[in-house]
Swiss-Prot record:
Residues at which NADP(+) binds: W72, N74, S206, S207, S209, R230, T231, R413
Protein name: Trimethylamine monooxygenase
SUPFAM superfamilies to which the protein is assigned, alphabetical: FAD/NAD(P)-binding domain
Description of what induces expression: Expression is induced by TMA and HHP stress.
Disulphide bridges, residue numbers: none
A Gene Ontology molecular function term of the record: NADP binding
UniProt lineage: Bacteria, Pseudomonadati, Bacteroidota, Flavobacteriia, Flavobacteriales
Region forming the signal peptide: none
Gene encoding the protein: Mptmm
Pfam families, per database record: FMO-like
Organism expressing this protein natively: Myroides profundi
Reaction catalysed by this enzyme: trimethylamine + NADPH + O2 = trimethylamine N-oxide + NADP(+) + H2O
PANTHER family: DIMETHYLANILINE MONOOXYGENASE
Protein's job: Catalyzes the oxidation of trimethylamine (TMA) to produce trimethylamine N-oxide (TMAO). The produced TMAO is accumulated in the cell, functioning as a piezolyte, improving both growth and survival at high hydrostatic pressure (HHP).
Record keywords: FAD, Flavoprotein, Monooxygenase, NADP, Oxidoreductase
Length: 461
């Protein structure tokens, strides 16, 4: 074991990727640092853990997850597949390109269960504060053990922050919303469309969450869905029952007034207004301050905190790629901590960051964003031994996905893609997505006899 201690905060996909990167090194017979990982939930998986709870959890901590019932992947699984652990290896059979949350969570766990990673994780443990001790070149981290109700501290040579950035809601105020008589919630607290059956729903925001929650509510029987946008509409071909309107100006009782002068009564308002990058355990001089960008400012290679080279952030970007991008970041971070990748001086790092930040500003369309993140991942892979894969083909799938959604927002999840890792083409799910109301793993993997007439695709337009 190397004479280094590495602390990892968070055991979601990013934290698990970091553990997997070190495990990969250890399997080659090479020494690795002493590693400790801390997770405030009682299980790994981060955002992929579903809980019925909202607000606070069992121990009074803010709920981390934003997952809801009936959530299915909104992008092809072939675009997020691990290069060292494929869907075929895990499920032993082809599955559809858009599986539900429970299926993806099972896949994430499958890879990490092959290792002893759980031995490195202390669950129900919250990071409360971090200090950097300049004289020792170490971080002092104060933790709370939620089960024992005890506080303790640890010291690390490197600190990896993998806490994600989709758990602290951005909650704007709209005049009159405090007197709205119906349900008002942020998407973070949305737990299922079945509570909005036969309701008129207003979604404020034009994010992926607005898009998906809107379609989910339509699918499960909401009377109407309105999506209110600030700058640009989503622009999909919406079915009857879903419409887009410009931003809400104010509320009067249960009536929302819009910038175009129109108004309508609603039963519920769901704020799909994004999330904040929040790190309450980090002091100001160690805190990443960024919005949801494809390339966060002040992170060298999107990973190393430029003001303190021993502080590492994983998964802090806006994301097209997810699991496999976290892997490439973790492999880069590992090799840097092991001394294989030397950082240039701060002036050169500043220029490198500025180059990427400026490049993002010139990327406007969804396809350009995909190309941007593809090039970013290519650069990271070239610097490590992470198993390479055909990123250009994955990028083409992403672009096809963008077109699929624009063409048919309700049925794009019925399309199938071919894995670049295995060459296996996905199978169509036994039930068209708009007809499938059961998102359980058991139902998904079962061979179900279907009534073809009953499942024939309806014209929702």
């Amino acid at each position: 074991m190397l004479n280094l201690k590495v602390g990892i905060i968070g055991a979601g996909p990013s934290g698990l990727a970091m553990l997997r990167a070190f495990e990969s090194e250890q399997k080659k017979g090479n020494p690795i640092p002493e590693i400790k990982c801390y997770e405030k939930q009682d299980n790994w998986g981060g955002m992929w853990n579903y809980t019925w709870r909202t607000g606070v959890g069992k121990y009074g901590e803010p709920i981390h997850g934003s997952m809801y019932k009936y959530l299915w992947s909104n992008g092809p699984k072939e675009c997020l597949e691990f290069s060292d652990y494929t869907f075929m290896e895990h499920f032993k059979q082809p599955i559809s390109s858009y599986p539900p949350r429970e299926v993806l969570f099972d896949y994430i766990q499958g890879r990490i269960k092959q290792s002893n990673a759980r031995d490195f994780i202390k669950f129900n443990t919250v990071a409360r504060w971090v200090d950097y001790l300049e004289d020792k070149k170490q971080f002092r981290v104060i933790f709370d053990d939620l089960v024992k109700n005890e506080t303790f501290e640890e010291y690390f040579d490197y600190l990896v922050v993998g806490t994600g950035h989709f758990s602290t809601p951005n909650m704007p105020y709209f005049k009159g919303i405090d007197s709205f008589p119906g349900t008002v919630m942020h998407a973070h607290d949305f737990r299922g469309a079945d509570q909005f059956i036969d309701k008129d729903i207003l979604l404020i925001g034009s994010s992926y969450s607005a898009e998906d929650i809107g379609v989910q509510c339509f699918k499960h029987g909401s009377k109407s869905v309105t999506i209110s946008y600030r700058t640009n509409p989503i622009g999909a071909k919406w079915p009857k029952g879903i419409e887009e309107k410009p931003i809400v100006t104010h509320f009067e009782d249960n009536v929302a007034h819009f910038k175009d002068g129109s108004k309508k009564e609603y039963d519920a308002v769901i704020l799909c207004t994004g999330y904040q990058h929040k790190f309450p355990f980090l002091p100001d001089n160690l805190r990443l301050k960024t919005k949801n960008n494809l390339y966060p400012d002040n992170l060298y290679k999107g990973v190393v905190f430029n003001e303190n080279e021993r502080l590492i952030f994983l998964g802090m970007q806006d994301q097209y790629y997810t699991f496999n991008m976290f892997d490439t970041q973790a492999w880069f971070a590992r090799d840097y901590m092991l001394g294989r990748i030397a950082l240039p001086n701060k002036e050169i790092r500043d220029k490198d960051i500025a180059k990427w930040v400026e490049l993002e500003k010139t990327s406007v369309t969804g396809e350009e964003h995909v190309d941007f993140q593809t090039d970013y991942i290519k650069e990271l892979i070239e610097m490590t031994d992470y198993p390479t894969f055909d990123l250009d083909r994955v990028a083409e799938m992403f672009k096809s996905w963008l077109n699929d959604k624009e063409t048919n927002i309700l049925n794009y999840r019925d399309k199938v893609y071919t894995s670049v890792m295995t060459g296996v083409t996905a199978e169509e799910h036994h039930t068209p997505w708009m007809k499938e109301l059961d998102d359980s793993l058991e139902r998904y993997l079962d061979e179900v006899e279907v009534d073809e007439l009953e499942l024939s695709k309806e014209n929702y337009y």
